Amino acid sequence: MADPSDPMKPDGEVNPIDTDYQIGQDNIVVKVGPFGLDIHNRVFLISGLSVIVFVLLTIVFHSQAEPLFASMRGWLTSNLDWFFISAANIFVLLCLVLIVSPLGKVRLGGTEATPDFGYLGWFSMLFAAGMGIGLMFYGVSEPLSHFSSAYGGTSFEDGVRTDWAPLAGAGGDAAAAERLGMAATIYHWALHPWAIYAVLALGLALFSFNKGLPLTMRSVFYPLLGERVWGWPGHVIDILAVFATLFGLATSLGLGASQASAGLNYLFGLPQDTAMQVLLVIGITLIALISVLAGLEAGVKRLSEINMTLAALLMLFVIIVGPTVAILTGFVSNLAAYLQHLPALANPIGREDANFAQGWTAFYWAWWISWSPFVGMFIARVSRGRSVREFLVSVLLIPSLACVLWMSVFGGTAIRQVVDHGYEAAASADLPLQLFSMLDFMPWAQVTSFIAIILVVVFFITSSDSGSLVIDTIAAGGKVNAPTPQRVFWCTFEGLVAIALILGGGLVALQAMAVSTGFPFTIVLLVACIAVVKGLMSEPRPGKV
């Protein structure tokens, strides 16, 4: 067993990195009465000041910011869609190669390390990492959108394709459109995003548990940069990680605010406008701040567990009350459709469905990549003692299957309402309202819609609270117990960035910043793949897994 006094200490054989660097040696430590700061002098100052300037400029010049964000998103996705799609394919292929190679025998934490959590608890945490505001927002809207686009078929104007259907569409064929729509949805929520998370989580766990380096992004690059990783190259990597995580979280928080606003409008007739979204962000950020100030980590964890239970109960309700047989058979047929269409959906070149590849896929991959430091660090923390093979198989499959089930239940039900009953309220509603419109066709709609709002709000709180911890760890040079005021700063600015983006263009601005920060961090992750392989090759491997 590992030394309980040092949970990061390796167990058994490892090949640690010999470095004189001490965690926090470059930090500025300030103590003022009961308060204090312990910040990395360059990472915190540069990223913190940049975020402050961004928020101020975007709020003050929000009318000028809106067209800027729209053009920025359009340029990045239309010119770099091939890059994002290719990068995501590389992450999947790397995971598959590591699973079947001898490197899969390397154990995180040392050859004798034992898991900190049993399978059930570990799988539950992986499942929890896959749930969030995104599934609540897109669980109904994305399958419906792809189904409708595919059913409408292709259209051209001056020889240029103008429709949003994935691949070649399925003009007029409802069954084929449903299969293609669900396959396209699952493509965005299954193996590819979880491969992105898995690669970074593996790197963080390997270089922390096995190599004895700080739990921060720069540590992953030690095999390539050596001691320079503690200088400016490492500073840049950590600063990019802070930006990516902050804007990735802000995108999710903005989506959550728009959906909560739509739900409150549906239930209570409250205004569904920008002001309401801003008020929701302020209110929920204040709740997250209270949890940070009061040290309610245990309470937030408990709240997250309750939320997961509520999500499971809501899903079970839809399965039982909705088209049960169609949902259960659809889960299998949707997986089959996903595997059938996967090669074409993942093809980065010669695509005719430019709107789908650029407007959906490129955005998603950039968004997932910007989320990767947040989710990757969480997965790394709970995966000590697992072999690389066990780790990758579980991280790829368990959350992917959970996401497929969620999309099959909510998206499949919405599609069946259209096809079997001609109920098109959900399909014609605005994106944030589509979940509530789908629930409105079922019994106890007021109750289930209220539960859905609670789910969105609590996912918002837990994401903000946990995200501030991850950002603070990076900006504190790898220290995991930095002073509370630092987390207050990051938690506050997660909300302020979301507000700035809502004022600066809403969904378009949120997506623009996710893509903008995701692009440079994609380059960081691609280089990290090389570092991870080099790190694994230097590790001792037991004869048996």
Identify what each model region corresponds to:
Residues 2-165, 175-177, 293, 316, ...:
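N-terminal alpha-helical transmembrane segments of multi-pass membrane transport
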Residues 15, 35-45, 49-59, 92-95, ...:
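Helix-loop-helix module between adjacent transmembrane segments
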Residues 27-33, 67-73, 101-119, 144-170, ...:
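Flexible loop linkers connecting adjacent transmembrane helices
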Residues 31-36, 61-76, 96-116, 180-188, ...:
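Membrane-water interface regions at transmembrane-helix termini and the short interhelical loops
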Residues 39-43, 105-124, 325, 329, ...:
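C-terminal membrane-solvent junction of multi-pass transporters and transport-like membrane proteins
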Residues 47-55, 284, 398-402, 486-502, ...:
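Hydrophobic membrane-spanning alpha-helices of multi-pass integral membrane proteins
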Residues 50, 83-100, 311-322, 402-412, ...:
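Hydrophobic alpha-helical segments of multi-pass membrane transport proteins
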Residues 229, 233-389, 393, 398-450, ...:
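Membrane-embedded translocation segments of transport machinery
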